[in-house]
């Protein structure tokens, strides 16, 4: 069992009327509450923006894994030092090898933690018309290319739109 969490994106938080000031601080504080609750069932934490004093029922056994949807260097370092790894969307193999792995692995090693999990998700499609499907994926999911964190990953990978990262081909 693994719990995946993420920071969201400024534009999405604005739509909900929620501020996006200092997202890395928010992530650190959130994990300062979440991780002890999952580990021991109790927490006493007072941060700059988040506070929690609670005790919850926790069943016996190991805590569930926790991964952070992290793309930028700061978030990857937090994930590497505080969680079990990261979960990625719209990140290609070049960027994983040259940016994601070195950043999160170095943070984990510096913190004396085991090598973190890296979970990558990409659409996989079988079709008789790969070009048309890639075009449709890019049109349907164009918003990802407009979000700063994904746009940065596209640039690192050398692609311009989501369809360029999809694994698309024919059955033959």
How does the language model describe each region?
Residues 1-172:
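Active-site-adjacent structural elements that line small-molecule/cofactor binding pockets in enzymes
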């Amino acid at each position: 069992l693994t719990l995946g969490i993420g920071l969201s994106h400024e534009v999405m938080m604005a739509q909900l009327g929620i501020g996006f000031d200092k997202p890395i601080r928010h992530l650190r504080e959130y994990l300062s509450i979440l991780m002890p609750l999952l580990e021991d069932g109790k927490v006493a934490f007072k941060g700059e923006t988040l506070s929690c004093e609670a005790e919850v029922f926790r069943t016996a056994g190991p805590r569930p894994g926790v991964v952070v949807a992290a793309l930028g260097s700061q978030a990857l370092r937090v994930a590497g030092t505080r969680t079990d790894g990261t979960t990625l969307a719209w990140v290609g193999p070049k960027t994983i090898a040259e940016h994601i792995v070195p950043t999160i692995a170095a943070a984990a090693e510096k913190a004396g933690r085991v090598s973190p999990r890296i979970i990558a998700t990409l659409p996989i499609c079988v079709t008789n018309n790969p070009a048309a499907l890639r075009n449709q994926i890019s049109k349907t999911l164009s918003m990802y290319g407009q979000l700063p964190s994904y746009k940065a990953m596209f640039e690192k990978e050398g692609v311009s739109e989501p369809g360029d990262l999809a694994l698309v081909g024919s059955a033959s």
